[in-house]
Regions:
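Conserved SAM-binding loop of SAM-dependent methyltransferases across substrates and taxa
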Residues: 90-101
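A short, conserved alpha-helix within the catalytic core of class I
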Residues: 165-177
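S-adenosyl-L-methionine
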Residues: 121-150
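A short SAM/SAH-binding and catalytic strip from SAM-dependent methyltransferases
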Residues: 154-168
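Class I SAM-dependent methyltransferase SAM/SAH-binding core
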Residues: 103-132
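Conserved beta-strand signature within the Rossmann-like core of class I S-adenosyl-L-methionine
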Residues: 180-181
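Conserved Class I S-adenosyl-L-methionine-dependent methyltransferase catalytic core
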Residues: 1-77
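Conserved class I S-adenosyl-L-methionine
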Residues: 78-89
Length: 181
């Protein structure tokens, strides 16, 4: 995860807005829960956040977004059983959800090359990950999605990815998004 081209594509680094997000998490009544989710893994040696070295900017940013989701929609992340992530970066969000619910069914749609990076990161963190019938399934073919997705107690995640793809690919996912609970 320390290669320059990976850093440019997948990391928010030591930005000051991350400090604002971290401070919001610290003020949250669930801080002790979020604090556990923030603990960074050693796999890939992610760049640690300079003002909170037990985590990275990415992990703080993801956990902050999840706290906003919980608070805004009044949902419990632990009750989500199925997740479809459109564009999974190196696998950070999937790793966080593995710590939220170890029985989660998680699907990541991405390019094959990025799926390989996700495979390495998640496998090195001890997760059941693969391209066929795993708890963490990696998908790079749109035609295979409907066979693999369970929409009950589910969540569709797309942090930046929907804005980064061609409109025709994005349009393919619009009908899927509305089916998630």
């Amino acid at each position: 995860l320390r290669y320059a081209f990976i850093q440019k594509m997948f990391f928010v680094h030591n930005r000051l807005f991350i400090l604002k997000e971290l401070n919001e998490l610290k003020k949250n009544k669930k801080w002790f829960y979020y604090k556990k989710l923030l603990l960074e893994d050693d796999v890939g040696d992610p760049v640690r956040y300079f003002l909170y070295p037990s985590s990275s900017g990415n992990k703080i940013n993801h956990v902050y977004h999840l706290s906003c989701l919980e608070n805004t929609l009044n949902i419990e992340l632990q009750k989500i059983k199925n997740i479809f992530e459109f564009g999974g970066g190196y696998g950070c969000m999937a790793r966080i959800f593995s710590n939220i619910n170890n029985k989660i069914s998680y699907k990541i749609f991405d390019t094959y090359i990025v799926n390989c990076l996700q495979y390495y990161y998640l496998k090195q963190n001890g997760l059941d990950v693969g391209f066929e019938n795993n708890k963490f399934d990696l998908i790079n073919n749109f035609e295979k999605i409907n066979d693999k997705v369970d929409f009950k107690n589910s969540l569709f995640i797309a942090n930046w990815s929907l804005s980064e793809v061609p409109l025709d690919l994005r349009d393919n996912f619009v009908s899927l998004i509305g089916r998630y609970e």
